[in-house]
Amino acid sequence: EAEKCTKPNEQWTKCGGCEGTCAQKIVPCTRECKPPRCECIASAGFVRDAQGNCIKFEDCPK
């Protein structure tokens, strides 16, 4: 059963991956599943900022 993600632009994933951040948009990642969690919706261009929010990569502080 999917958990509720409380922050905007997050989605629950049963097979956790490697999230992009403002510091590194694409994070090299193995194919093994990490623990299930809420992750930023990478397919829509969202990455995790320093405050833990999911924002568009182009909106990251320069």
Swiss-Prot record:
Cysteine disulfide links: 5-38, 15-33, 18-29, 22-60, 40-54
Any one Pfam family match given in the protein's UniProt record, by short name: TIL
Keyword field: Disulfide bond, Protease inhibitor, Secreted, Serine protease inhibitor
Keyword RNA-binding: no
Location of the TIL domain: 5-60
Localization (cell): Secreted
Cross-referenced InterPro entries: Ser_inhib-like_sf, TIL_dom
GO MF terms held by the record: serine-type endopeptidase inhibitor activity
KW Ubl conjugation (keyword) present: no
An annotated GO cellular component: extracellular region
Signal peptide: none
Stated family: Belongs to the serine protease inhibitor-like (TIL domain-containing) family.
Name used for this protein in its record: Trypsin inhibitor
Taxon lineage: Eukaryota, Metazoa, Ecdysozoa, Nematoda, Chromadorea
